[in-house]
């Protein structure tokens, strides 16, 4: 290590980031906007390529090959941002006492360390789960690209935000799609069932077989005819592809191994600092104020705040009310604020092509909303009315 990367106490000045997803790359960009000279090292198990993750929900209808998703190679990103990149370098552990990141390629000291380790797609524990495909990264898409492009019969497990987007996208390309969920309605973690009725109709009109209230029991190989899929109610079907879209689980192994405080995610304070004063976390791996925030806007705002903190100006993360967009073209939805809870009173305006639904608390104050179909223009005026 050169003397230029050490402070007066002989400790590394380098900011080391573990991970190369959206959170890691957004942080690097935010740091570089503020400081052109700060030493930054990014360590990642993959190539570090830059791509737009939300595009994964629409690759089938757009006929987009996995390679075409890449906007910038990892090496070009590193050159553009003037950082040291260690691609294909899995991190084996962290030694907080010595401020070292341990890898098969050696030990790397840090002044401040940022965990941007992301989250992994959840795979249900059932016979044949190894046959499930996940689409949580460009790399996962590349690994299954051939099977995805050839599949005509597709079962999507999980009717959450990503599952609904995938199902509608694949059905719009002429695939025979089954969308399966244990809950009684799609988007059950986000919305009451009544407000999903237009989306259910749109999915079915697109050709999706929406089957709520039942789960997946097992997947068996069926030589020459894809997979034999058994549902929890005993029904059996043949599928060419089974996709798991039942949510994400933060990657916590490195944080746990380093002795950091974790619950559902890596626990951080308002400055995104972990239980170790020299280690921070950002993105899908983080639990902030009791919440997991697997959306892009909190990551962008978090990266901006964390960059200032890392460079010596502590800047607490502050999140305004944020829109969640469900990109289902036949019936898109946008929502914000509190949209689930038995204490909410809903005021709904419907027409044949859209809806505006306002959630009010027991004091009658607006606390959340959903807009759908052709009513997208109502979202921002309502967003401005939500309490901050």
Sequence positions of predicted segments:
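Short hydrophobic core segments
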Residues: 17-18, 108-118, 239-247, 303
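Mid-to-C-terminal Rossmann-like scaffold of FAD/NAD(P)H-dependent oxidoreductases
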Residues: 3-14, 285-378
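FAD-site-proximal beta/loop scaffold in flavoenzymes
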Residues: 130-149, 225-230, 236-305
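A conserved beta-strand/loop element that lines the FAD pocket in flavoprotein oxidoreductases
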Residues: 80-95, 207-216
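Beta1-alpha1 glycine-rich phosphate/pyrophosphate-binding loop at the start
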Residues: 3-83, 169-190
């Amino acid at each position: 290590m050169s003397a230029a990367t050490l402070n007066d106490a002989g400790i590394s000045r380098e900011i080391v980031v573990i991970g190369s997803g959206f959170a890691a790359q957004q942080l690097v960009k935010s740091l570089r906007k503020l400081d052109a000279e700060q030493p930054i090292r990014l360590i990642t198990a993959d190539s570090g390529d830059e791509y737009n993750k939300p595009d994964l929900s629409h690759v089938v209808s757009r006929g987009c090959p996995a390679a075409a998703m890449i906007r910038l190679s990892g090496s070009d990103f590193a050159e553009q941002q003037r950082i040291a990149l260690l691609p294909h370098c899995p991190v084996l552990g962290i030694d907080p006492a010595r401020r070292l990141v341990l890898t098969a390629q050696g030990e790397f000291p840090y002044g401040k360390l940022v965990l941007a380790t992301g989250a992994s797609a959840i795979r249900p524990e059932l016979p044949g789960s190894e046959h499930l495909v996940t689409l949580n990264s460009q790399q996962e898409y590349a690994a299954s690209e051939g099977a995805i492009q050839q599949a005509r019969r597709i079962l999507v497990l999980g009717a959450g935000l990503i599952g609904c987007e995938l199902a509608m996208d694949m059905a719009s390309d002429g695939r025979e799609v089954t969308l399966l969920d244990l809950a009684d309605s799609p988007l059950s973690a986000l919305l009451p069932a009544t407000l999903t009725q237009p989306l259910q109709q749109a999915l079915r009109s697109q050709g999706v077989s929406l089957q709520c209230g039942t789960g997946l029991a097992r997947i068996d190989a069926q030589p020459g005819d894809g997979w034999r899929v058994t549902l929890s109610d005993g029904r059996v079907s043949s599928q060419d592809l089974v996709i798991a879209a039942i949510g994400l689980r933060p990657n916590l192994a490195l944080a746990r191994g380093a002795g950091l405080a974790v619950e559902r995610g890596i626990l951080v304070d308002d400055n995104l600092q972990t239980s170790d004063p020299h280690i921070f976390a950002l993105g899908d791996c983080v639990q902030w104020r009791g919440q997991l925030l697997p959306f892009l806007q909190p990551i962008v705002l978090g990266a901006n705040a964390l960059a200032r903190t890392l460079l010596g100006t502590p800047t607490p993360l502050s999140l305004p009310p944020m829109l969640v967009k469900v990109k289902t073209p036949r019936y898109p939805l946008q929502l914000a604020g509190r949209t689930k809870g038995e204490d909410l009173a809903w005021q709904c305006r419907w027409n044949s092509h859209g809806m505006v639904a306002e959630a009010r608390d027991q004091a009658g104050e607006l606390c959340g909303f959903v807009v759908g179909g052709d009513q997208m223009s109502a979202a921002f005026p309502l967003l401005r009315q939500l309490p901050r």
